[in-house]
Every structure is written in structure tokens, then in C-alpha cells.
Amino acid sequence: MEFPDHSRHLLQCLSEQRHQGFLCDCTVLVGDAQFRAHRAVLASCSMYFHLFYKDQLDKRDIVHLNSDIVTAPAFALLLEFMYEGKLQFKDLPIEDVLAAASYLHMYDIVKVCKKKLKEKATTEADSTKKEEDASSCSDKVESLSDGSSHMAGDLPSDEDEGEDDKLNILPSKRDLAAEPGNMWMRLPSDSAGIPQAGGEAEPHATAAGKTVASPCSSTESLSQRSVTSVRDSADVDCVLDLSVKSSLSGVENLNSSYFSSQDVLRSNLVQVKVEKEASCDESDVGTNDYDMEHSTVKESVSTNNRVQYEPAHLAPLREDSVLRELDREDKASDDEMMTPESERVQVEGGMENSLLPYVSNILSPAGQIFMCPLCNKVFPSPHILQIHLSTHFREQDGIRSKPAADVNVPTCSLCGKTFSCMYTLKRHERTHSGEKPYTCTQCGKSFQYSHNLSRHAVVHTREKPHACKWCERRFTQSGDLYRHIRKFHCELVNSLSVKSEALSLPTVRDWTLEDSSQELWK
């Protein structure tokens, strides 16, 4: 025989006992607030309290909760839920209840809080979208009414029409707001000399002057009036022409000021002559690879009408590279046959020399260059220097040779594996022999390695050096603590880490306003 109301009656009695302080065997402290409760109820509803009372039941009369995570109102709400089975958020933030439930491992409450937060986010997004749509609609109505008022001012008014007829030409903002679906206006059909879309002329207005036009006819009349206004407004074109000329003159003044400031730097920099004149006597030099590679640079310099400079210590490098290329061409014309070795050396030298003209373009802002310590060649980046150094080592060392046979290398006699020293070889030999030289003095258990023995010794000393900072539970091994955190506190740790990163990182707006502006004006 079952009593369906027994569980509800039991919870009601326990809740009354808690409020009276009758048979309460524990005290929960959250900051300065104290809560009297029963251990059995707390351990039944929260996995945190279940683990807390599992180890030492007699010595856990007072429980301290982390007040940074669990607030007193949130814990009071969860305590009421434990005894009554009802969750009433009232005016409490859902985030506080979620943090407290995660801390106490009350996963049903966590699911409810997450669902409420999701619904709250969706409702806020919908409300903001509706506000944006309403504001955009009102802006369109205002712009349409302003444009219609301007057009009404430009319309030729007849002397026979009265003020009442003029007021009825355009609708007011109140009428437009009252009828948001009808986004059209009332316009007089005074286009006697303008043909319609079908080729027919629109008749004149009646004496009253009140004609209602459909949306299509209103848009057609608007387009026709705009065409006629563009044709008749010659003065507006002149004004636009003057504005363009003034803007161009401003750009010319800016360019002149820029080049005048660049003249000051000519005393400290060496000008590089990229483009050669046609009347130069050394016109044959312009046919080499250097000028062909820099043809694009010449075109960009001529089109942009700018002068390029480079540091003075790079000018001799360019001259040396040109001279080396000329010498290489002379040698190539003299030698008809080339061996594969000389061809490889020439290709490598050509690659290294071809990098030198680009030093000024690839240089870092600090103007650093990287020199090879073996051949004193200069390279624009450390990556290219590393590639160059690998060619030196490949030529000197060649393929890495194996150690000589007479050298004693620690080798395992069973599997043939080699090791760097005898200590690692001895450790490896224990895997074959099964030797366990390290023995525990308490229980006589043996181990292969010393660190395993030190880990085992903690079992006899009953020490628990590894403590969980979330629930204050202690463990003998670090691996047990890691598994405990992953099992019970994974969601809480992830949420707190995301919050801390969001608070510590600067915003993108602050970075762009401060750092980028300083870099630009340096």
C-alpha cells in the first residue's frame, strides 16, 4: 500500500525542523551568513556535500563555502529548493544561481539556469532587432516626408489653387505613421508636357486640384520631375565643378607640402638612381638582369611621381652586385663549355647576389641586415641566412657519417638498442630482466624506479599534499586530483577561465586608438 503524499509530507517536516533549528547537525558558512541544515538532506541533494562528508563524518560540523563563487542569497535559494522542491529566482541574477549550483554539483539546477539564460539572450536579441527595424522605418518615413516637402516647394503653383488644395498635396507625418503599409504620396498631375510611360500625356488637374495617385504613378512622376530638374539646373553643375576643383587644389597643396618636407631628408640619405637616362653612355648595363627585375619598380616610381631612398650603407652593396653580375656575364661569354660543378656554383652565387637588390625593400623598420659569419655575405632576413648557412655545412660535412666501429656505444645485448650513456642502458635492461631494486621498508613492495617508490611511500604516511581549491578535498597523488577536477569541476573551471580572460584582455577599440596611433606618428 503506497502513500503518494509521503515524500512531500517528509520534506515539509524537515523544512519546519530546519526553520526551528531542531536536529540540525551542521552549519554552512557563506561569508558572514550562517545556515543551519541537516547533513542527510545536503548530502542527498548535492554531490559536493556528499563527497565532503564521505571521508570524515564526525569532524565536519562546520562547512565553509567559497564566498567568491557562492553568494549568500544564491545558497539560501538552493537550500530552499533542497527542502521544498521549488525553485523561485525572485530578483536574484541567474548567473549567481548558476555559479552556486555548479560549485555544489547540482546539475539539474545548472541545466535550468542555462536554459533561462539562453531564453533571455534570444528575447533580448529579438527586442533589439524590433527596435532597430522601428527606428529604420521611422528614418525612412522622415526622409520621405522631407524629400516630398522639398519637391512640393519646387512645384510650380497655380494662382487658381487655394491654400487648402496645397495642404492636401502631401500627407503629414502623422498620416504616414498611421499607415505604415502605404508608403506613397499624393502628387498633383501637372505633367502636361511630359509623356507618361505608356506614351500618353496625363490630363490636367480638376478645379479642386485633389487627385489621388497610385504608388506606381507617384514613383513615375517623381522620376520624371527629377529628370526635368536635372536638365534645368545648370547652376548646380557649376557649383559641383567648383567643389571638385577646390578638392584637387587641396590635394596638390598636400603633395607640395609632403615633397617639401622630404627635401630636408636628402642631406642624410643617399639617393638611388633607379631609372637611367636614354642619353647615358653605359646603356649596355641596362640590359642586364638587374634592370629587368626592377622594371616594375621604375614604372611604379614614374606613375606615383615619388622619390625612393635607401640607407647609405646599402648603396655599395648594390654597386657590388651590379659589378659581379657584369663579371659573370663576361666569364660566361668567354667560356663555351662549363662543367656541372661550376654551373652549380654559378647558380648559387646568382641566387645570393640577386637577393642583394631587395635588401632595402625587405628590411625591417629598424634597418637590420644579417651577415654570414663564414663568407661575410649580407642577407635581408634570418631565414634566408639560415638557408645560406645550410649550404656551407652541406659542403663541409656532407652526409653525416656513422660513428666508427671502434667507439664503444652503450648497446643493449638483447634488442640491440643504443643509448647515450650507461645509466640509461641499465634502466632499459630492467625491462628485460624484471629487476626491481627499490623496495619499500613498510610493506616490502619492490619497484623498478626510485620515483615510483617515493610515490608509493605516501600511502603509508597518509599524507594528502594535493588539495582541490574548489571543494577543499585532498588527495595523495596528483593524478587523483586531476581526475577529480575533470569529473566534478570541469564546467566551473572552464566558465571561470573564460571570464578571467575576458576581463584581463584589452578591448580592440583601446588597442587601435592608443597603440596604432603611436606607431603611426613615430
From Swiss-Prot:
Residue ranges, annotated region (Interaction with DNMT3A): 310-427
Null allele phenotype: Death shortly after birth. Brain of mutant mice display dysplasia of the neocortex and of the hippocampus, reduction of the number of mature cortical neurons and defects of laminar organization. In the cortex, an impaired cell-division patterning during the late embryonic stage and an enhancement of apoptosis of the postmitotic neurons are observed.
Cross-link Glycyl lysine isopeptide (Lys-Gly) (interchain with G-Cter in SUMO2) per UniProt, renumbered positions: 273
Family annotation (Pfam families): BTB (PF00651), zf-C2H2 (PF00096), zf-C2H2_4 (PF13894)
Ranges of Basic and acidic residues composition bias in the record: 121-143
Domain of life: Eukaryota
Gene Ontology MF annotations: sequence-specific DNA binding; zinc ion binding
Residues modified as Phosphoserine: 157, 516-517
Keywords for the protein's UniProt record, in alphabetical order: Developmental protein, DNA-binding, Isopeptide bond, Metal-binding, Nucleus, Phosphoprotein, Repeat, Repressor, Transcription, Transcription regulation, Ubl conjugation, Zinc, Zinc-finger
Zinc finger (C2H2-type): 370-392, 410-432, 438-460, 466-489
GO terms for biological process, alphabetical: cerebellum development; cerebral cortex development; hippocampus development; homeostasis of number of cells; in utero embryonic development; negative regulation of DNA-templated transcription; negative regulation of transcription by RNA polymerase II; neuron development
Assembly and interaction partners: Interacts with DNMT3A.
Family from the record: Belongs to the krueppel C2H2-type zinc-finger protein family. ZBTB18 subfamily.
PANTHER family, per database record: ZINC FINGER AND BTB DOMAIN-CONTAINING PROTEIN 18, ZINC FINGER PROTEIN
Protein name: Zinc finger and BTB domain-containing protein 18
Organism: Mus musculus (Mouse)
Gene: Zbtb18
